[in-house]
């Protein structure tokens, strides 16, 4: 699975991350913002279902409108994170190669060897 992301505005991604962070904090604190009369386990279940729905929206490659199990959603998320790590690793490796080439060139230029220029 290739990490190809549809174009999203930065504000919508930021809002989604904030939403997930707020939900995670409310779960960790044990507060249920769904309603005062709601049982704790049911509140957590609704929060988790909301988180899975948000993951389906945010992770590219998950078919929208299809019924996936929670395990399948998590597998798509894991695959996407792995793809991102590979892409970031390749970018980092390319930038380090370019910086090495630049430093090698600057060493040659400071040695005063004019035969390189001819």
Swiss-Prot record:
Subcellular locations according to the entry: Nucleus
Domain of life per record: Eukaryota
Impact when changing residue 59 to N: Disrupts the helix-loop-helix structure. Reduces ability to inhibit bHLH complex formation
Induction annotation: By bmp and notch signaling, and in response to signaling events of early neural crest induction. Repressed by hes4/hairy2 in a DNA-binding dependent manner through repression of bmp4 transcription, but up-regulated by hes4/hairy2 acting via delta1 activation. By myc.
BP GO annotations: circadian regulation of gene expression; negative regulation of DNA binding; negative regulation of DNA-templated transcription; negative regulation of transcription by RNA polymerase II; neural crest formation; neuron differentiation; regulation of cell cycle
CDD domains: bHLH_dnHLH_ID3 (cd19693)
Key words, A-Z: Biological rhythms, Developmental protein, Nucleus, Repressor, Transcription, Transcription regulation
Cross-referenced Pfam families: HLH
Name of the featured protein: DNA-binding protein inhibitor ID-3-A
A single GO cellular-component term on record: cytoplasm
Subunit structure: Homodimer. Heterodimer with other HLH proteins. Interacts (via HLH domain) with the bHLH protein hes4/hairy2 (via Orange domain). Interacts with stat3.
